[in-house]
């Protein structure tokens, strides 16, 4: 191994300290060797929920026990790792490309072996195909929710205030700071608006920074509720907002639409498809989509939503019809049962 490794270093990393190269390659390969030495339980099918190391373990089980592999990706794991590696300070710069190629190699293996590969929405399926997965293997199985929990929630009475909700963990990936800045700008334009941020603190440091930002800006009518019963709290809301910088198919948006509440979201994951419809969906627009981290765009979109109750109600009804047609819990279970039967 050391002879091979030395040759690789001389050929590809002549100006990188040997210790950096050694520990990087060790970190990359040791988990793979541990996994390949694992005893995988016997199963009728191995269903991985990501590529990467989990996908490798599913491939090992398939190879040892001669059983089919299924892959479900809620996010495109390889792309997520690529973005993380590009931004990371802990990765030796000269090894970033090798780390990225390593994760692409792992995804190629399970894409090749899998009997079927599912994603949550059409653009994710296109990404899987672009990354080398056989199009005939790829199908979309969306998330599903229990519509009955939300469909009869009454609309909030028109009391002169517009109440905006955000069902969100306080974590950097949710970009709550941009939400706070955008709401501050909105409140300067429309004084009778309130923002309810509903969710637990996922990152204590980030949560403290969000509270400090509210104090620094002097934002009024912003409520951190902590964790709440979303079904009960939805009665207090006119519409919802999501400002994440990365998502798959957010359940919070589906639940909001199921409750006849339109949404303002960033253009991440499946959000545009949820609010504007996939090909063949003619229900119409159920909210507004803005670029991530764009404060003014978010404030503008919220203002448009705030200024017309009739528009909010119409958009909410469109969203509820979309959920009732494409995103039911029962449909999701039936689709996965059919997939298991097919194997």
Residue ranges and their predicted role:
Residues 33-42, 77, 94-117:
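Membrane-proximal helix-turn-helix segments that form the acceptor-binding/catalytic region
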Residues 62, 297, 304, 311-326, ...:
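A short, well-ordered alpha-helix in the C-terminal region of glycosyltransferases
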Residues 123, 144:
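Carbohydrate-associated surface elements
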Residues 154-185, 196:
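Conserved donor-binding/catalytic core segment of Leloir-type glycosyltransferases
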Residues 196, 207-227:
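Nucleotide-activated donor-binding/catalytic signature segment of Leloir-type glycosyltransferases, i.e.
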Residues 245:
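Aromatic "clamp/platform" in nucleotide-sugar-dependent glycosyltransferases that forms part
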Residues 262-265, 269-276:
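Short hydrophobic beta-strand element within catalytic cores of glycosyltransferases
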Residues 277-295, 304-309:
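Conserved acidic donor-binding segment of nucleotide-sugar-dependent glycosyltransferases
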